[in-house]
């Protein structure tokens, strides 16, 4: 094709000079370059990047087997556990959009979001079974419910058709996941909390998520392979994009179910934490923690 601009002649986009911006590329690269580096720490769980990558692929495959694909919404009602991190990759790897629900909301609000976002699948932790059960009774949509059984979770009712680990096992680690065809395709759907009226939906696209993730690195002057403590909820603006940021840096995600001083101080010492996030109230809680909590 000939153009009036000489710099555009025979320079159309192709696989050699262009790829869509997406945080999914971060996981693929990190698993290839640092397969044996620790990716996730949670209780007694230790997984490297290759293992984590394969689990994300199997999640994408399992969702695809349910008929989930581009434009479908997959919701999660999860604390900061490994499954929440995996959902940030596995859900968009099958073309779907992740809706991370605020675990502090009431059943009526959760029901509204499930309906408004048209969720086809819901990943949920048994700690929130009372709220989720009521929400499912209130909402018009009937998502497929998958229980995430975390060994550190308190008691609760299992509500789903299947359990998360069994669901993953139904997937294929050789599943041919693909980048988005357009970097403006949606990767996640978030909702406002604490506003007047009903929650308002906010869409992230792959391009924006990738750029913000990289922006986190430059803003913090982050060094290679950080050790990040999950004190910030992943449901809060997708954890400010740090699920993707830490992955891009080949770092280690140290999961934390509850943001409490004792476990935070313990994790900082035990896992040599280099970075963490938190609202001022979280930092104030740490500053004002008891001597016993600080020594935990």
Which residue ranges define each predicted feature?
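Conserved AMP-binding A3 loop
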Residues: 48-51, 178, 187-211
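Flexible, non-catalytic linker and terminal segments flanking ANL/adenylate-forming cores
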Residues: 1-20
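Conserved AMP-binding/adenylation subdomain of ANL enzymes
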Residues: 210-227, 235-275, 288-291
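Conserved AMP-binding/adenylate-forming core of the ANL superfamily
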Residues: 19, 24, 28, 36-81, ...
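Structural core segment of the AMP-binding/adenylate-forming
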Residues: 26, 65-66, 93-169
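A short helix-loop-beta submotif of the ANL/AMP-binding
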Residues: 60, 72-73, 79-103, 107, ...
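Adenylate-forming
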Residues: 79, 124-133, 151, 232, ...
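Conserved pre-ATP/AMP-binding loop-to-beta segment of ANL
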Residues: 35, 147, 161-162, 169-191, ...
């Amino acid at each position: 094709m000939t153009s009036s601009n000489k710099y555009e002649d025979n320079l159309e986009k192709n696989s050699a000079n262009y790829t869509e911006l997406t945080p999914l590329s971060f996981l693929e690269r990190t698993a290839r370059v640092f397969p044996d580096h620790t990716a996730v720490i949670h209780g007694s769980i230790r997984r490297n990047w290759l293992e984590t990558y394969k689990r994300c692929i199997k999640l994408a495959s399992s969702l695809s087997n349910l008929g989930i694909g581009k434009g479908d919404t997959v919701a999660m009602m999860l604390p900061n556990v490994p499954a929440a991190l995996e959902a940030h990759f596995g859900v968009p790897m099958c073309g779907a959009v992740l809706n991370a629900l605020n675990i502090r909301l009431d059943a009526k609000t959760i029901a509204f979001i499930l309906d408004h976002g048209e969720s086809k699948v819901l990943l949920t932790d048994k700690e929130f079974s009372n709220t989720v059960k009521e929400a499912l009774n209130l909402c018009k949509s009937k998502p497929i419910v998958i229980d995430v059984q975390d060994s550190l979770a308190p008691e609760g009712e299992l509500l789903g058709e299947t359990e998360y680990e069994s669901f993953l096992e139904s997937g294929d680690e050789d599943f041919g996941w693909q980048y988005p065809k357009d970097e403006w395709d949606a990767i996640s759907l978030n909702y406002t909390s604490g506003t007047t009226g009903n929650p308002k939906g906010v869409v992230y696209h792959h391009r924006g998520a990738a750029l913000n993730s990289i922006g986190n690195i430059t803003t913090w002057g982050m060094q290679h392979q950080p050790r990040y403590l999950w004190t910030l909820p992943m449901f809060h603006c997708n954890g400010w994009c740090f699920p993707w940021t830490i992955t891009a840096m080949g770092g280690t995600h140290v999961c934390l179910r509850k943001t409490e001083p004792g476990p935070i101080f313990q994790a900082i010492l035990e896992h040599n934490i280099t970075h963490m996030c938190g609202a001022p109230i979280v930092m104030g809680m740490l500053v004002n923690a008891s001597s016993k909590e600080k020594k935990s």
